Amino acid sequence: MVRDYVLARAEGQCEHCNEPAPFTTPHGRPYLEAHHIRRMTDGGPDDPRFVIALCPNCHRRAHFGHDATELNEDMLRHVAAVERE
């Protein structure tokens, strides 16, 4: 599952701000949210090259921030670099 892969790839850190997950889940896992940089509802793929693990604040910013478009483009470049490694 793409979500599980992306959360594991993040190793407990937000892939945008690099801060540790803000808390752990009841199962002891770091809490991060999978963000589809190209939204699936807009035809974006469910592919690790287009999904990033974010803390809740960065996730909200990616959707509702005044700089959301630029932020998502930066995230896309970051994920492309990580997936090439």
Language model features with spans:
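Glutamate identity and glutamate-enriched acidic tracts
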Residues: 11, 15, 19, 33, ...
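Cys/His-enriched microdomains
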Residues: 12, 32, 49, 53
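Short Cys/His-rich local motifs and their 1-3 flanking residues in nucleic-acid-associated proteins
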Residues: 19, 56, 60
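Short Cys/His-rich "knuckle" micro-motifs
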Residues: 24-27, 35, 65-67
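Active-site lining segments that contact anionic ligands and/or coordinate catalytic metals
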Residues: 29-32, 59
